[in-house]
A protein has these predicted regions:
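Solenoid-like repeat scaffolds
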Residues: 37-44, 75-81, 113-119, 148-156, ...
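Solenoidal tandem-repeat scaffolds enriched in leucines and small polar residues
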Residues: 152-257, 261
């Protein structure tokens, strides 16, 4: 992760340019009108301006080795302003991040916060980065504490921040809290991330709230009715809720609309029909999938086909499927089923 545009802008606006420009920057629109933190003075010595300016440029260019020299010089100055010290620790945190030293990066970012010298926008962004890294490092309690600190200081909530909070709650098995936070995040975003819906869906699943899970997918399908991924998700919800008829119905509709084009989808539809005691329909789906070359001709699929045909009382179909499964069978179960099918098809000599 390179320094983002917000950081480059702040470098230019606070302290690394003339004092007049810094004053002008303060007159720009306030991103956090409800902030409870007082804006500190963004000032530093000419030596710190020079060294930290060079360090920031080098970090932006991916030249962390060169940046380190100037960051170290700035950190060694005992009389540097709080802003210079905070900014130097922020740069050091970025260098550690680029080196995949996440605990060290978090520690340096935290020092930048504790010194309390950064302008509000920069301070809040560093705090948010800490929460993101804590989540990444599986310090979920820490991430929640940092997000709470961010909310208190900024006096606001955002969709992204709420989604981060929901993610942490989910990892801590606090599913209702995850649902509440993620539902609010999604409601605040014009284009919520797919991962947000996945976390919300998973939280519903953990609490057995299948109706809510189904409603969530149905809302998404209303906007994108031919999205096979969403259709499969809705079918999965119905399966988990033991509503096999509904699962089979939605997959059948997808098939009728020409949306089922993979072997996996054919197999899933066949299994759904079988679970709903619609074995003839299940056998027909398997037959069609094999005929189109979509279902892979392997042991598992032939065994499934044979089992479905047996349940559909279609001995010829079962015999054909079990015969194809037999050469790669891991045990004698398929051969036993094949013998059973041959016997009841009045082909007892072959069964022996």
């Amino acid at each position: 992760m390179k320094l983002s545009s917000w950081f480059a802008a702040l470098v230019c606006a606070f302290g690394l340019v003339a004092a007049g420009n810094a004053l002008a920057a303060r007159k720009t629109q306030n991103e956090y009108p409800n902030a409870t933190r007082s804006e500190p003075r963004a000032e530093m010595s000419s030596a710190d301006q020079r060294d930290l300016g060079k360090a920031a440029d080098y970090v932006n260019e991916g030249k962390d080795d060169k940046a380190q020299e100037y960051v170290t010089k700035a950190l060694s100055r005992k009389r540097s302003s709080p802003y210079a010290q905070s900014f130097a620790h922020q740069l050091q945190g970025q260098i550690y991040y680029d080196q995949d030293k996440m605990p060290e990066a978090i520690a340096e970012y935290r020092k930048a916060i504790e010194i309390n010298g950064l302008p509000n926008a920069q301070h809040f962004q560093v705090l948010y980065i800490i929460a993101q890294l804590e989540l990444q490092e599986e310090d979920y309690e820490g991430a929640l504490a940092t997000v709470a600190e961010w909310e208190k200081l900024t006096g606001t909530q955002t969709a992204d921040e709420l989604a981060l909070k929901a993610n942490a709650y989910y990892r801590l098995d606090q599913y209702q809290a995850a649902i509440d936070a993620m539902s609010k995040a999604i409601s605040m975003s014009d284009k919520p991330s797919d991962s947000w819906s996945q976390i919300l869906m998973a939280s519903y699943f953990e609490l057995g709230q299948y109706d809510q899970a189904a409603a969530l997918v149905q809302q998404q399908l209303a906007k994108d009715p031919k999205n096979m991924k969403l259709i499969n998700q809705l079918a999965t919800v119905y399966i988990q809720a033991d509503q096999m008829d509904k699962a089979a119905a939605i997959m059948t509709k997808a098939k009728d609309e020409g949306l089922i084009t993979s072997g996996a989808d054919y197999v899933q539809l066949a299994k759904l029909y079988a679970s709903a005691d619609k074995n003839k329909e299940a056998a027909a789906v398997m037959q069609e999938g094999f005929a189109k070359g979509l279902i892979e001709g392997n042991y598992d699929n032939y065994k499934l086909y044979g089992d479905i045909c047996m349940q559909a009382d279609n001995d010829a179909c079962a015999i054909e499927a079990y015969t194809k499964a037999s050469p790669t069978a891991p045990d004698g179960n398929v051969d036993y089923q094949l013998g059973y099918a041959l016997y009841y098809a009045d082909r007892s000599q072959e069964a022996i």
